[in-house]
């Protein structure tokens, strides 16, 4: 049986934890950077977006029990202090460990594979968008993989269809993006004036790494795409708008047919 651990139980980590438990996968250990076991339990049971998780919760010492399943917990900021003996797969959802130099510390503790919930711009790390390039994964080569980013997962299937069938000359990407923990609730002094504005009262233009992440999947598009994000005061929905100039003439009919065919074929269940 494969033993799984999660480091970081924020927005993404919480949802992954729920999926692992719901699908009866062997989650052995969870580390959260903040709080304690009781605040973690409360955060899992009561979610501001998805409501109450109808599961049985119990906390004993440093052990969390969900539907009777025992999960060892800790609350550390340092990878070296984590309890990773016998862990096969570590899912890093901290949002801060985004370099191979830092992530290698997991292997020193005995972890066999690391999956990161954020994109990493390093050639030795596979940025995987399921349905688009999962075939590049080589178990003997890739010890660290990422699931890219939410925006990259949104646009990569679209780009796959257009670029592989017609060819993209260049393009622009705009994402209307949920607010995140990297922002501030109230106005504060900040070296980036936009980042210092209240997340709950403003539409905040900022950067997005999605265009760069796409070039990791399609190297020939490097420098041909640009993008920006607008952070908006919502938590659970985003929208991405793409404008492309194609390499050859096309039509609405051709484009729609390509998307329909892909949605019923290789991208079924991914492309709506």
Q: Which stretches of residues belong to each language-model region?
A:
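N-terminal Rossmann-like NAD(P) cofactor-binding subdomain of oxidoreductases
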Residues: 1-185, 189-196
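Active-site-lining helix/loop region of Rossmann-like oxidoreductase modules
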Residues: 3, 7, 11-18, 25-26, ...
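Short glycine-aromatic motifs
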Residues: 57, 270-271
């Amino acid at each position: 049986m494969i033993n799984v651990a999660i480091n970081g139980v924020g927005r993404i980590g919480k949802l992954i934890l729920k999926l692992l438990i719901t699908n009866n996968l062997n989650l052995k250990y969870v580390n959260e950077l903040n709080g304690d076991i009781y605040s973690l339990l409360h955060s899992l049971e009561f979610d501001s977006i998805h409501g109450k998780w109808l599961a049985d919760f119990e906390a004993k010492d440093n052990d969390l029990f969900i539907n009777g399943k025992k999960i060892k917990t800790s609350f550390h900021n340092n990878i070296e202090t984590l309890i990773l003996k016998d862990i096969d797969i570590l899912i890093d959802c901290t949002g801060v460990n985004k370099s191979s130099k830092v992530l290698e510390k997991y292997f020193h503790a005995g972890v066999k594979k690391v999956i990161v919930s954020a994109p990493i711009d390093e050639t030795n790390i596979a940025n995987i968008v399921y349905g688009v390039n999962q075939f590049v994964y080589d178990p003997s080569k890739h010890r660290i993989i990422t699931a890219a980013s939410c925006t990259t997962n949104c646009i990569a299937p679209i780009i796959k269809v257009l670029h592989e069938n017609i060819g993209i000359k260049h393009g622009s990407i705009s994402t209307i993006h949920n607010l995140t923990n990297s922002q501030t609730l109230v106005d504060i002094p900040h070296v980036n004036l936009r980042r210092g504005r209240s997340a709950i009262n403003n539409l905040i233009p900022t950067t997005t790494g999605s265009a760069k992440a796409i070039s990791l999947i399609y190297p020939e598009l490097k420098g041909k795409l640009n993008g920006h994000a607008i952070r908006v005061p919502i938590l659970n929905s985003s929208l991405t708008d793409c404008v492309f100039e194609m390499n050859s003439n096309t039509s609405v009919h051709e484009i729609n047919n390509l998307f329909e065919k892909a949605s019923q074929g290789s991208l079924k269940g991914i492309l709506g």
